[in-house]
Each structure stands twice: as C-alpha cells, then as structure tokens.
C-alpha cells in the first residue's frame, strides 16, 4: 500500500510538473515559421566581381607595359624617348618593375579578401566548393610570385651583363604576357565554378548528401566504392562536416530559444 501510494504521488508530481511547464503549455509554432527560421539561407559568393576587377587591372597593366616598352625604349632601352619624359628620372624598365610589384601587392590584398569569403562559405557547410577552388586561388598568386622571381633574375643578369639591353626588355615583356595568360586561365576556371555555384543555390553539402541517399537507385552497390580518392580527403571532409554540424546545432538552439521566448511573451498569462 505504501509503495502504491508513492507511485501515485510520483505520477501526480510528474503530471503536475508537466502541467506547470510553460514550454509544453505554449502553442506550437507554425510550420512556415519554423521553415523560415531554421532552413539555412543561401548566401552567394561575392568574389566574382573582385576577380574580374583584378584580371582587368592586370590586363591594363600589361598593355601599358607593352606600349611603354615599345614606344619609349626601342631600339635602345637605355634611352628614354617617351614624350614629355614621363618616366624621368626612372628608366622604363624600372617603372614596369615597380608597377609589377604594386600589382602583386594588390593581388595579395584581394586574395585575403577572397579567402575571407571562402572561409565563411566553408563555415556554412559548403565544403565541396571550398576544396574545389582553393588551389585555383593559390595557383594564381603563385604564378604572379613566380613571375616576380623571374623578373628579379633578369634584373640580376642585366646588372652583371648590361650589353644586350633590348634582350632583357624583350624577356621582361614576354614574362608579363605569359603570366597574364596563365593567370587568365586560372581566374576563368574559378569564375565559371563560382558562377555555377551561385546560380545553383545549393543547400549545405550534408543536406545535399541526404537527398542523394534518400534515393537508393542513385547509389552504387559496388563493394568498397568511394567517391573520394585519398584518406586525407575523407578525414578532412568528415572534420568539416562535424564542425558544420556543431555550429549549425548551436545556431538552431539559439533560434529555437528566441522563437520560444517570443512566443511565450505573446501568450496571455494563466491565472
């Protein structure tokens, strides 16, 4: 009898605690409100304009370098024949090298800006686009850095053997043209990838994978099949997924708490 009384008291306490819980007594949030607050919103990458601007500045610099070198330094690079002596007291080659250095610094700053937005898109769960474009960004900067190294080597050779001055100018202009072509290829591939990504407006990678696995016919039944080639990429992908889920769960908890608090505030107090 005593045990039965304790069980009845325990069930009564549980029932009373449930009735007194304001969260359970609150009205359920509408479905469209949950969709609006909890569904991840797509944020496009705003880096295409920056990349196109960088390529345009690079193109203008190479054109001006060719015009300045051809019009002001041929046939003797040691003589400045520019109208009005615009480059005086500097030589034409010195002006071209200074412009190249300024262009490299500008590219480095814009690379930091692009990397900032790519880190943000990675934190939102878009790891595939991050991994597929990170080498393109680095490659473009490496091409320009390699061009600076070759130009430095040419200047060292010119300082030791100053006789064939026109040959050095031709080499400098050839390096600038080759660097422009290689950078254009990298930036063009990058622009196409980002535009396709922004146009598709996909959901985070983990949600896209859930859609794929929801249809068994789209999954290969081959034993040991892997879509990723190396173990390092698998570990990196799993780590990115775990980090995204942790951030996403924390964000959902904050939004749910805010929605519940606002909904409870709108409810009339019970007497």
UniProtKB/Swiss-Prot annotation:
Subcellular location, principal: membrane
Subcellular location: Lysosome membrane; Late endosome
One Gene Ontology term, aspect cellular component: late endosome
Membrane topology according to the record: Multi-pass membrane protein
Transmembrane segments: 47-67, 94-114, 139-161, 172-192
Segments on the Lumenal side according to the record's topology features: 68-93, 162-171
Regions of this protein lying in the Cytoplasmic compartment: 1-46, 115-138, 193-271
Positions bearing Phosphoserine: 17, 229-230, 269
Keyword terms of this UniProt record: Endosome, Lysosome, Membrane, Phosphoprotein, Transmembrane, Transmembrane helix
Family matches, as Pfam families: TMEM192
Subunit and interaction comment: Homodimer.
Family membership noted in the UniProt record: Belongs to the TMEM192 family.
Name of the protein this chain belongs to: Transmembrane protein 192
Organism encoding this protein: Pongo abelii (Sumatran orangutan)
Lineage: Eukaryota, Metazoa, Chordata, Craniata, Vertebrata
């Amino acid at each position: 009898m005593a045990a039965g009384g304790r069980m009845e008291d325990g069930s009564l306490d549980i029932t009373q605690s449930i009735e007194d819980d304001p969260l359970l007594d609150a009205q359920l949030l509408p479905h469209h409100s949950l969709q609006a607050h909890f569904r991840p919103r797509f944020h496009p990458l705003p880096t295409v304009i920056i990349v196109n601007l960088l390529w345009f500045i690079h193109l203008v610099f190479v054109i001006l370098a060719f015009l300045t070198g051809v019009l002001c330094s041929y046939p003797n690079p040691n003589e400045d024949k520019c109208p009005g002596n615009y480059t005086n007291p500097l030589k034409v080659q010195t002006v071209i090298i200074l412009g190249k250095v300024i262009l490299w610094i500008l590219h480095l700053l814009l690379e930091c800006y692009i990397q900032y937005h790519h880190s943000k898109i990675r934190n939102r769960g878009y790891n595939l686009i991050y991994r597929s474009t990170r080498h393109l960004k680095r490659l473009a900067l490496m091409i320009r850095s390699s061009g600076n190294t070759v130009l430095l080597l040419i200047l060292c050779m010119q300082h030791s053997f100053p006789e064939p001055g026109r040959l050095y100018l031709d080499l400098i202009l050839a390096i600038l043209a080759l660097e422009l072509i290689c950078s254009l290829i990298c930036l063009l591939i990058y622009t196409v990838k980002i535009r396709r990504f922004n146009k598709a407006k996909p959901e985070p990678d983990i949600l896209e994978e859930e859609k794929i696995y929801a249809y068994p016919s789209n999954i290969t039944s081959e034993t040991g099949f892997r879509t990723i080639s190396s173990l390092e990429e698998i570990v990196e992908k799993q780590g990115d997924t775990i980090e995204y889920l942790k951030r996403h769960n924390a964000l959902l908890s904050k939004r749910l708490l805010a929605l519940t608090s606002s909904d409870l505030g709108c409810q009339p107090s019970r007497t």
